[in-house]
Amino acid sequence: MRTPTIRAAVAVLGTCVIAACHSAPEPEPQPIAVIQVPSPVRYTGGEQVLAAMRARYDGKWYSTLTFRQKTSRLGTDNKWNDQTWYEALRIPGRLRIDFDPVSAGNGVLYVRDSAFTIRNGKALPPTASINPLLVLGFDVYHESAARTAALLRKEGFDLSRVHYASFEGRPMIVVGATAGDTHRPQFWVDVERLLFVRLIEPTPRDSTRLQDIRFTNYRQVGEAWISPRVEIWSEGKLVFFEEYSDIKTAVALDDALFDPTRWNSAKHWMKP
């Protein structure tokens, strides 16, 4: 899972997008089609949307998840560079990413509102950090709407701005911007399924440019869902993507996996 908030410490965690982009000016965004909503519900505020997401899957969304991730970044030479990451989630608020090889002890750990970069099994000092993809793609289905809303406001989303649009043939609720505005931080939610689909935000190192992050190819897992492919687009070009395999939910995970002081000693889900 892309980790956009550890931007300076780990280049591949979101800042990799910047390396793939050239200095051309941001093109004018294409007009967004405004649609009539087929649902009887008309949301007028972002917190209403978050509450509906929580209510739809209350008691149905998995609380643990593991997967192997192929991470592909487009280099300045226009060639794709691939890495393998191993990820474990305890929802809400905990995400562990091990970089291949796991034995090297390198990775990133999110624990609630803090993030740790791990090098050689040792945690660097934490930074206050929120991962909006973790919040919107997973935590929202376990947290209260008030808690999720507070986190997103900290990240610069204006929850008072809501409109409806379409994306890839499906109706969407857009929170954070008015119709036609693609320059404000905003997230898109599928009207029918109430699943997070898209996030548009300024790039980490240049706030005048945008990146478009997409959760794609959703598939059902029991009564919940998972997106096994995440894409990042910049200036109309795919520059980064993640593909998940060996996906498992309801996994028994050692609590120590999410303790930065026990990175190497925790019982790892990848090891027998």
Enumerate the language-model features and the residues they cover.
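C-terminal motif of bacterial Sec signal peptides marking the signal peptidase cleavage site
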Residues: 17-20
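N-terminal mature ectodomain segment of secretory-pathway/periplasmic proteins
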Residues: 35, 41-123, 156-160
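Flexible, processing/modification-adjacent segments and terminal tails
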Residues: 41-46, 116-183, 203-209, 253, ...
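Gly/Pro-enriched, hydrophobic low-complexity segments
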Residues: 104, 168-264
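Intrinsically disordered, low-complexity, charge-biased terminal/linker regions in eukaryotic proteins
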Residues: 29-35
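Bacterial signal peptide processing site
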Residues: 22-25
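Bacterial N-terminal signal peptides that target proteins for export
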Residues: 1-10
